[in-house]
Amino acid sequence: MDRSPLFLIIMGAPGSGKGTQSKLLASQLSLLHISSGDLLRDAVSKDTPLSQEIKSYLDQGKLLPDTLVWKLVHEKLDEFQQDTLLRRLSFLSRSENSAILDGFPRTVTQAKLLHEFLSSYFPNYKVILLDISDEEVLNRLTSRYICPACQGIYNEQQGFSSCPKCSVELIRRSDDTLEVILDRIQTYKQETQPVLDYYTEKQKLITIDANAPTQQVFQSILDSLSASLVYQERDCCNCDCDDED
């Protein structure tokens, strides 16, 4: 696969495997894994003006406005972009000159803000959609267990009662109930479809069948990325963007 800097955004319904696939891709392609959920938890644990602003919304049970969530993500992206420039100037390898973003954007406004930023530094960024059926989401979420220590995810079929890595007893998430899961699926569809439409229009979307086993989904992503990047290279080589008048 092409070794030039790469930026990926991964999207999908609850239970589609975003976290798992993000980690696999980060390891395989030397990507920095940026999770908006991790950024939020980290921000709340600190005492900064931004964290205080976030806490004020959370304490009132209010949703964070798009601009505030973007400020949090942009802070990390700006830090990452500056590090990337330093690596390029130092003629270092691509290792972590590229990244995968998980959990953001969730609205069209957020998508537009992110697109404006990425267009300047990673114009060929791609959005991976893990497309999964409602039935498979229900099957996965109603049978999953989580390690409270390392956040590892396991399912009933694996037969673990404790985490094989931490030896900590596995637990069920309190919101992994049928009623809550159905509500989360519906909310996801309502919120995400406009974002998917936006990325489809921008020709950034790569749709992957996520109903398959983990490794099969992972290979499908790699194959699709390779095909997409090769096509982009050929398209660029055939254009006259570098031709003089």
From Swiss-Prot:
Cite the EC number. 2.7.4.3
> Organism source for this protein?
Chlamydia trachomatis serovar D (strain ATCC VR-885 / DSM 19411 / UW-3/Cx)
Which amino acids does the record list as binding Zn(2+)? C147, C150, C163, C166
A Pfam entry, by short name:
ADK
Domain notes per entry: Consists of three domains, a large central CORE domain and two small peripheral domains, NMPbind and LID, which undergo movements during catalysis. The LID domain closes over the site of phosphoryl transfer upon ATP binding. Assembling and dissambling the active center during each catalytic cycle provides an effective means to prevent ATP hydrolysis. Some bacteria have evolved a zinc-coordinating structure that stabilizes the LID domain.
Keywords noted in UniProt: ATP-binding, Cytoplasm, Kinase, Metal-binding, Nucleotide biosynthesis, Nucleotide-binding, Transferase, Zinc
How is this protein named in the record?
Adenylate kinase
Which gene is transcribed and translated to give this protein? adk
Q: Which PROSITE patterns match?
A: ADENYLATE_KINASE (PS00113)
